[in-house]
């Protein structure tokens, strides 16, 4: 039986001899020649179970740990990165109106965003925010949304600026809930006011009992947020969202291209073919207008 060196100590060094037992001269000579061993008294090592593995150092819990979703811990960082990449792809595909979001350069668990409110009580409001994603996503709690400047709103904490997201996502369910839904909820709260269990009781009371004063407070809040729109980002991150004043030398040309952009003729013909209208003459919507006989050279 091969044993780990940790277990290779002989169990006979402490064996109790009979009173009349004497060692031979040869054994005494061997003992003098060999280095002295530490005395273990009369104690013996416990017997080794048949299938036991030697323990040479404390076992690391992370070595055998598994994530809640069954993924081995060693794959955790890669699984998290893939999940966040998939979530950001979903955000792009949803084309959320009035919302722009950008992951942080330093951490994929932090996203910078801005919401543009185009009508309603918060019209013309431009609210910058940060999304904080749990490090065990998607098996943890709901991502948090914190506004850079606290907005006067029943569901926004007047001190920290955090939006009450958990009322909409009481329990985060992986593969069912997505970050784009959190972003959409952050936009919806400015169009549909909910005063139940508010984080800002003052805003809730004014909305229910004195809507005119509530509107006045909202206007002041919007002006405050917009007045800090061109401030430098609070975080030192190259991907943090920042605004700059209109610069005609830079922005006029980009604006002109946006308004005068036209599809190229080849793109137009390609679109007709892809749509299955091969029997329609390019530039026409009349059925069967395409000439079946190609021109002869």
Swiss-Prot record:
It is a peripheral membrane protein. Gene3D superfamilies: Ubiquitin Conjugating Enzyme (3.10.110.10). Keywords: Apoptosis, Cell membrane, Cytoplasm, Membrane, Protein transport, Transport. GO terms for biological process: apoptotic process; early endosome to late endosome transport; endosome organization; endosome to lysosome transport; lysosome organization; protein transport. Residues 79-227 form the UBC core domain. The keyword Ribonucleoprotein does not apply. PROSITE patterns: UBC_2. Residues 25-39 have a biased composition (Low complexity). It is found in: Cytoplasm; Cell membrane. Belongs to the ubiquitin-conjugating enzyme family. FTS subfamily. May function to promote vesicle trafficking and/or fusion. May also regulate apoptosis. This is AKT-interacting protein.
